[in-house]
């Protein structure tokens, strides 16, 4: 009778160890899942932050940290910004390296070479 109880206890202990070891092996996967879930939650909450500051403004109308910031640009800065935007629109370097080098025939065993 005692032998049967010992065998059952050892079987349950082995089963518990097997379950616990599988849980520990999948722990990095759970960390990755939780990190992705947190990133999605932060990304989803991003547009609502302006609404939060609006609510705070109703409670604390004189708080300087909640006032909208006005940024003054020098007269020539707007023209410079427009020129930079025009340059960035037509810039072929915005493409990934593989697409830029689509016609490249040189191939090195570690990857594509610059042509």
From Swiss-Prot:
One of its GO terms (cellular component) is extracellular space. GO terms for molecular function: hormone activity. Keywords: Cleavage on pair of basic residues, Disulfide bond, Hormone, Secreted, Signal. Residues 19-87 form a propeptide. Residues 1-18 form the signal peptide. InterPro entries: Somatostatin, Somatostatin/Cortistatin_C. Disulfide bonds join 104-115. Its main location: secreted. GO terms for biological process: regulation of cell migration. It is found in: Secreted. Pfam families: Somatostatin. Belongs to the somatostatin family. Somatostatin inhibits the release of somatotropin. This is Somatostatin-2. It comes from Oncorhynchus mykiss. The lineage of its organism: Eukaryota, Metazoa, Chordata, Craniata, Vertebrata. The gene is sst2.
């Amino acid at each position: 009778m005692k032998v049967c109880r010992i065998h059952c206890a050892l079987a349950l202990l082995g089963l518990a160890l097997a379950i616990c070891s599988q849980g520990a092996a999948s722990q990095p996967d759970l960390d990755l899942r939780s990190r992705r879930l947190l990133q999605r939650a932060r990304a989803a909450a991003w547009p609502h932050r302006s609404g939060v500051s609006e609510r705070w403004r109703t409670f604390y109308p004189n708080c300087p940290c909640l006032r909208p910031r006005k940024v003054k640009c020098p007269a020539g800065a707007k023209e410079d910004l427009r020129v930079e935007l025009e340059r960035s629109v037509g810039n072929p370097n915005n493409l990934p390296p593989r697409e830029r080098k689509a016609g490249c025939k040189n191939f090195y065993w570690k990857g594509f070479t610059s042509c």
